[in-house]
Amino acid sequence: MLYILFKYLLTPFFWLFYRPKVKNFGRLFFRGRGILISNHFSLGDPIRLAMVAPRPIHFMAKQELFDTPVKRFFLKGLLAFPVYRKQADMVSLKQAMSVLEKNHIFGIFPEGRRSLTGELDSFEKG
């Protein structure tokens, strides 16, 4: 699985150079299902969250990122699945429910885009 390969190859470098500070580490999901909701500040947010999480996170990502076969292969290998953000997307909602039913962690950035100011923005519909 691509996710596991990247996580275990990159995590030592990530911790060495980035030195993340994790608050409330005990609240991270060690077992059972969970939903990880986060503000989105940079392109590296999903990577940073994946590196500190004790278990894989299945992220919902905007459909536009899946526009080529190569990108689609990598994103799906990294456990991401597409969401159409302009209206309610029942397919992605069912995918998220499936992730939770399997006792996995579902990750989402509900604003649907990066925040340039760090302030909470309105949520996307998807």
Residue ranges of model-derived segments:
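Helix-enriched interaction subdomains in cytosolic or periplasmic regions
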Residues: M1-F6
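Soluble catalytic domains of membrane acyltransferases
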Residues: K7, L16-G126
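Short, basic/aromatic beta-hairpin or loop at an interaction surface
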Residues: L10
